[in-house]
Amino acid sequence: VESFRAIGVPVTAAETRAHMGLTKVEEIRALFDIERVRAEFERKFGRPAGEEDVQARYAEFQRVLFASLEDYTDPIPGVVETISALRAQGIRIGSTTGYTRSMMDVVLPAATAKGYAVDNCVTPDGLPAGRPAPYMIYKNMADLAIPSVDCVLKYGDTIADIKEGINAKAWTVGVVLGSNELGLAQEEVSSLPADELEARKADVRRRMLAAGAHYVVDTIAELPAVIAEINRKLEIL
C-alpha cells in the first residue's frame, strides 16, 4: 500500500489482501494488473506501467518493510501452544512464505524469541515459483525427509495457501479468524455484531472450500483434532 501511495497511485487494503500469499514481487505485479490501478497509473504518468515500475515499487516495498518487519513478528494466539502439542506427537513443522530469505532472516529470530519456531522454513528464492505452485512444500519435504505427500498437511490463511496445498496434493486446511481472507484485527472481531461476524466467516469458509480446502477451521487450536481425523481416515484406507 505504502509503495503505491508514494507515487500517487493508491491501492486499497482489500486490493492488497486479494493477492496475499504470493511472492511479494508477484503481489505487486498483480496490483498493477488491476484495471483501476493500471488506468490511474497511465493517467498520471502518460504511459502504461512496465516491469521497471514493478521493480521500483518492489524496491520501495522492501525499504518500508525492512524498517518495521521485526515489529510484526508476534505469534497469533494459540500458535505456540498448538505447535508444541503437535511436536509432542512427533509432527515436524515446515513453513512456506512469500517473503524472501533476507526478510525471513529478520522474522525468524524475532519470532523464535517470542516462542514461535519451525523445524524448517522455505522461501521462494531459487525455486521455479512461489505460491500457489507446490515447490516450497516439496522443498520442505526434502529438507525434512518426508517420504510421501500423504504425510503432509498444509495449513494457511490465504487462498494462495490453499491452492499451494492442493497443487502439492497435500491435505489442506484453511483458517478463518486472524486470516488475511477475513481481514479483521482482533479488536475488530471483538467489536463486530455477532451476525455480521458469522456472515463474514461463512464467506471466507466458502471461498476456501471452493479453492479446494479439505477442512476449514476457526482457529489453529482446532488443528490437532483435524489431524486426528485425517489419521483415522488414513488407517481405513
Please place each PLM-identified region on the residue numbering.
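Glycine- and other small-residue-rich loops at beta-strand/loop junctions that grip anionic moieties
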Residues: 72, 96, 129
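Structural motif
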Residues: 19, 96-98
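N-terminal helical cap/lid subdomain that shapes the substrate entry/recognition surface
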Residues: 1-80, 84-89, 105
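Asp-based, Mg2+/Mn2+-dependent phosphohydrolase catalytic module
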Residues: 80, 84-88, 100-237
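A structural preference for short, hydrophobic beta-strand core positions in alpha/beta folds
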Residues: 13, 95, 216-218
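A general marker of short, structured functional hotspots
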Residues: 54-57, 95, 134, 151
